[in-house]
């Protein structure tokens, strides 16, 4: 008589139950993440709008000719760094809005989405940092105009333009910091919970 072996199901690893304290911590961290991302969305949007609308026209006196003036208009496309900052802020705002929608409609994140958010959080943080740093350097050169650079002191002629530009630089730096904190949270969720539970647990 042939022996029939009954296949034994392989032991499955069961995730440990989530304690009430862990659930409360997950909820609090998720709430913090959502607030950070919403603030980053607002700052990126403000940066983009303020820069795009930054335009000023002034009459400039020609040196050596007392009665001769020319009309000059400056806008954000005066320097490629400002155009880069507008693009970076727009991408940051769009990406943040996408993550906010995903986080609101779904209580859990799959591993693939968690990796996607982690990678793009890092990427956009560095893109925003590079854009803000480059724009700040160009703005500094335009405001102080070092003699060795042979630059014109733009801010002495276009004060409102520079003030509006300065406001956009501040909001861009704030958005960079907010993205950095969000990136840290997404890294925590991914690497601490990959083998335990989805990034955002229900409950």
Curated annotation (Swiss-Prot):
Source species, domain of life: Eukaryota
One of the record's GO cellular component terms: plasma membrane
InterPro entries: CASP/CASPL, CASP_dom
Spans through the membrane: 32-52, 85-105, 112-132, 165-185
Cytoplasmic-side segments: 1-31, 106-111, 186-203
Glycosylation, residue list: 67
Topological category with respect to the lipid bilayer: Multi-pass membrane protein
Primary localisation category: membrane
Extracellular side: 53-84, 133-164
Keywords, ordered alphabetically: Cell membrane, Glycoprotein, Membrane, Transmembrane, Transmembrane helix
Signal peptide positions on this chain: none
Xref: PANTHER family: CASP-LIKE PROTEIN 2C1-RELATED, CASP-LIKE PROTEIN 4A4
SUBUNIT field: Homodimer and heterodimers.
Assigned protein family: Belongs to the Casparian strip membrane proteins (CASP) family.
Protein name (Swiss-Prot/TrEMBL): CASP-like protein 2U6
Source organism: Selaginella moellendorffii (Spikemoss)
């Amino acid at each position: 008589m042939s022996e029939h072996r009954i296949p034994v199901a392989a032991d499955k690893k069961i995730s440990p139950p989530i304690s009430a304290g862990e659930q409360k911590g997950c909820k609090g961290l998720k709430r913090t993440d959502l607030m950070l991302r919403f603030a980053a969305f607002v700052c990126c949007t403000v940066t983009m709008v303020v820069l795009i609308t930054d335009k000023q026209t002034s009459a400039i006196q020609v040196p050596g000719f007392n009665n001769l003036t020319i009309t000059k208009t400056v806008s954000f496309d005066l320097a490629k760094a400002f155009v880069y900052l507008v693009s970076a802020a727009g991408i940051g705002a769009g990406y943040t809005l996408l993550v906010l929608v995903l986080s609101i409609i779904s209580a859990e994140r799959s591993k693939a989405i968690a990796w996607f958010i982690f990678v793009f959080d890092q990427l956009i943080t560095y893109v925003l940092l590079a854009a803000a740093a480059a724009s700040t350097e160009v703005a500094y050169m335009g405001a102080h105009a070092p003699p060795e650079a042979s630059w014109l002191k733009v801010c002495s002629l276009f004060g409102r333009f520079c003030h509006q530009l300065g406001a956009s630089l501040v909001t861009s730096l704030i958005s960079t910091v907010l993205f950095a904190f969000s990136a840290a949270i997404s890294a925590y969720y991914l690497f601490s919970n990959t083998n335990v539970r989805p990034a955002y647990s229900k409950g």
